[in-house]
């Protein structure tokens, strides 16, 4: 942006698109209630804004993500970005997809950029040590023993990996991905998640009075309000 003598903008979608579509799929196409707690969010809006601000970004736009907005075409969205913000360059991840039915993938947007000549597309390459596999329907579990659980695939042979993947209907994801981080946190593998995040994972919230269970389980606990 500085080289182009322009300004930088980050666009955030809130709530998370996956949360909105996941709720709609389970509730006959209904929108999630305003303010509904997103238990799968890795960071709050405030945390993201602090991180973005630390990078020196000029402006951040928070778009309320709704099913009505999701039904817009990627051409409409990009048209708004060009027409109202004067967008000259768009930076996306390699697996990004915009617009209704995720039709605006990198290839489609690249073709549009070349055809119009209005903006250029910069694609950020994937980072991290390749791919891993996570269960398709992984759910959080309480570790059975003290300490953090080990990687179930560590030291496994190819045959053992295939058997594990088949048993858990595992899907391939990037090691450095939010999907993998959620899986690791849900399994209690906090250190592995922290290694990907580059910092300790934290949950922010207001501490409230609870049932004082920490007195009975041998270690202190803190109760957070639902407004996390």
What residues fall within each predicted segment?
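A structural preference for short, hydrophobic beta-strand core positions in alpha/beta folds
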Residues: 10, 62, 123-124
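Active-site cores that bind ATP or allylic diphosphates and position pyrophosphate for catalysis
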Residues: 75, 79-228
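N-terminal Rossmann-like or analogous alpha/beta NTP/dinucleotide-binding catalytic cores
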Residues: 15-120, 135
């Amino acid at each position: 942006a500085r080289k182009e003598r322009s300004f930088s903008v980050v666009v955030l979608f809130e709530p998370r698109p996956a949360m909105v579509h996941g709720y709609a799929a389970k509730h006959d196409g209904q929108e999630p209630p305003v303010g509904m707690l997103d238990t799968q969010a890795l960071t709050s809006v405030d945390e993201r804004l602090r991180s973005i601000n630390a990078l020196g970004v000029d402006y951040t736009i928070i778009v309320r993500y709704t099913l009505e907005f999701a039904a817009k075409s990627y051409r409409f969205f990009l048209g708004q970005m060009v027409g109202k913000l004067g967008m000259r360059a768009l930076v996306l991840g390699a697996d990004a997809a915009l617009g209704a039915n995720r039709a605006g993938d990198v290839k489609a947007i690249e073709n549009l950029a070349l055809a119009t000549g209005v903006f250029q597309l910069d694609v950020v390459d994937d980072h991290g040590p390749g791919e891993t596999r996570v269960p398709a329907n992984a759910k959080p579990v309480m570790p059975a023993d003290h300490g953090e659980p080990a990687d179930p695939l560590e030291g496994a042979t190819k045959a053992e990996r295939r058997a594990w993947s088949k048993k858990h209907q595992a899907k391939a994801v990037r090691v450095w991905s939010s999907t993998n981080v959620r899986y690791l946190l849900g399994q209690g593998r906090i250190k592995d998640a922290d290694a990907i995040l580059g910092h300790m994972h934290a949950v922010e919230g207001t501490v409230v009075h609870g049932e004082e269970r920490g007195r009975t389980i041998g270690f202190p606990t803190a109760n957070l309000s639902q407004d996390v």
